[in-house]
Curated annotation (Swiss-Prot):
Species this protein is from: Buchnera aphidicola subsp. Pterocomma populeum
Keyword flag RNA-binding: no
Subcellular compartments: Cytoplasm
A Pfam family that the UniProt record links to this protein: Cpn10
PROSITE patterns: CHAPERONINS_CPN10 (PS00681)
UniProt GO MF annotations: ATP binding; metal ion binding; protein folding chaperone; protein-folding chaperone binding; unfolded protein binding
Keyword Zinc among record annotations: no
Gene Ontology cellular component terms for the protein in this record: cytoplasm
Family: Belongs to the GroES chaperonin family.
Protein's recorded name: Co-chaperonin GroES
Amino acid sequence: MNIRPLHDRVLVKRQEVELKSAGGIVLTGSAAGKSTRGTVVAVGKGRILDNGETKSLDVKIGDVVIFNEGYGAKTEKIDNEELLILTESDILAIVEE
C-alpha cells in the first residue's frame, strides 16, 4: 500500500530504541520508552500559505529526524510497519552525520 501525505504532513518510520543503558543495564517496559528519532519515508507537497502559495518542506525522503510526538501525531500500521504521520512543525531537527 502507498500513502502520500497531504500538505505539510510527513510520514516517518520510527527508529528502534536502544534497549541497553550506557552502563549496560537492559531496559524493559516503560523504561525503554519510544524513540523520538526516525527516517522520513514520504512528504507532502508543502504548507499552504495565507496567500495561497505552497511553501515546500525543509525535510526530504531519507532524512533522519528528531520529532516531538505531539497530540496531532497519528500512528498507522502499513504493511506490518508502524509509521507516524506528523506535521513538519512536529519535527524538531534533521540529524546530519
